[in-house]
């Protein structure tokens, strides 16, 4: 996918999110990628998934994110997603991330595809972490993923 696609996708997500935004709920986070731990450890995956991205929280339950990271099969992945986390327990949010990503040759030859994964988030005043589970599927070896983030606004 082209850069233009990702710019349009992120702008569309932000505009849609702003329409349902709650007052005083806006937060901007920068993430630096993270780590993965694959269920099948015999395949020599890269589990240090450094990257850069942004996440904009528009309500206690909803945020939009976009970024890029070095994935488990040593390719660059670009993504854009909406995180819907309706279950809150203090600073812990639980729900799902829904979005588009690329960079995995076994899925649509490395092109863009839809992805959904369960997502648990902890957000403190300045530091946060997203925890996800990628399930085992036909062409996907599952993993636990951890993404670290820092609040900038």
Task: Give the role of each language-model region.
Residues 39-47, 68-78, 88, 102-113, ...:
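Solvent-exposed loop/turn segments connecting transmembrane beta-strands
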Residues 30, 34-38, 141-153:
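Outer-membrane beta-barrel "beta-signal"
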Residues 17, 21-22, 58-60, 83-89, ...:
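Outer-membrane beta-barrel proteins
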Residues 24-28, 60-62, 76, 90-94, ...:
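Outer-envelope beta-barrel architecture signal
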Residues 32, 52-56, 80-84, 118-122, ...:
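Residues on the lipid-exposed face of transmembrane beta-strands in outer-membrane beta-barrel proteins
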Residues 1-25:
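Cleavable N-terminal export/targeting peptides
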Residues 20-68:
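Short glycine/proline- and aromatic-enriched beta-strand/turn motifs that initiate or cap beta-hairpins
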Residues 30-38, 62-71, 93-106, 120, ...:
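Transmembrane beta-strand segments that form the barrel wall of outer-membrane beta-barrel proteins
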């Amino acid at each position: 996918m082209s850069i233009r696609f990702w710019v349009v996708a992120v702008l569309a997500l932000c505009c849609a999110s702003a329409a349902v935004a709650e007052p005083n709920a806006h937060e901007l986070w920068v993430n630096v990628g993270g780590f993965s731990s694959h269920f099948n450890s015999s395949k020599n995956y890269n589990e240090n998934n450094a990257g850069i991205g942004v996440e904009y929280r528009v309500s206690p339950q909803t945020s939009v994110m976009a970024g890029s990271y070095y994935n488990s099969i040593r390719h660059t992945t670009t993504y854009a997603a909406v995180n819907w986390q309706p279950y809150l327990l203090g600073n812990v949010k639980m729900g799902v991330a829904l979005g588009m990503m690329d960079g995995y040759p076994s899925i649509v030859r490395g092109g863009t595809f839809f992805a959904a994964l369960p997502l648990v988030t902890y957000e403190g005043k300045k530091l946060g972490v997203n925890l996800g589970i990628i399930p085992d599927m036909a062409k996907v070896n599952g993993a636990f993923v951890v993404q670290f983030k820092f609040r900038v606004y």
